Amino acid sequence: MKFLADLEQLLVERRQNMPEGSYTTKLFQSGPQKILQKVGEETIEYILDAQNADKQKAVYEGADLIYHFMVSLVAQGWSLSDIIAELEKRHKPKGGG
């Protein structure tokens, strides 16, 4: 998880500084709709490789998917901790019998 936190911090810095020549900068400059389109494309690529049980390609596309998903979060001003908090909320033991 530390790596994902570090990656998120790098993405936040890229959004603030917009270094020239950075792929991430180009994504942020393209706007939220284009970023979300890229998330969709990477999702489809991951699904196709996973359905074909091609682990190497699925892992590669999964990494692309996570990266672009995180870019979409940062572009919206959201964070990975928002997603983690929701997952934790869903997995808390339910009260009662």
Q: Whereabouts are the PLM-identified features?
A:
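Flexible "arm" and connector segments at domain edges
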Residues: 1-62, 66-97
